[in-house]
Amino acid sequence: LRTSALVLYYHAPIDIMHALPNEAGTLCYAGEWHRFPSHFFVPPQVRVEFVESAFRGILPHHFRRGNASDPLWPWAAYTRTSPTHVNDRNAHEPDRYVALSQCSWLVDTHADDTWEPLMCRPFVDNEASRLAAQTWPLPAKIRATVARALYVPGWDDSLVWRSYCLLRRRA
């Protein structure tokens, strides 16, 4: 039941990666940065960056680039060095962002007219579903809570959905 819920309700971040063109460019994440599935889904010529959003904590940092010459562990040059731009307070680091104008593609739940959707998938909005359930009688609250975590046929009508999109800059 849990696995089914994960695939049906929360798979959109992986699904949209299949629509990413196999060409060089910059894929940007805004408010949905924490749902980035993995670099395994991104073509090697695509660089992943972040654009400024309402989030004010620390964002992931890129590994150092260098010459991967060690045949046993080619990532040694990248992983054996201590990063210099980290803090232990989860403090905002402005150097983690790029300008939106540098982005070829954007992953977000909404955008203005300068972007066109390449692929959008439905995605359960946990916070909105939880808030909506607070106004319901107790049995409906329980149903909505269970429906977010486990797939129970027919119970997904108590969930609030939104679109999770891969967007391309309009020409």
Please give the residue ranges for each predicted region.
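Extended acidic/polar alpha-helical scaffold segments
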Residues: 113-114
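Membrane-embedded, lumen/periplasm-facing catalytic core of multi-pass transferases
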Residues: 1-109, 123-134, 139-170
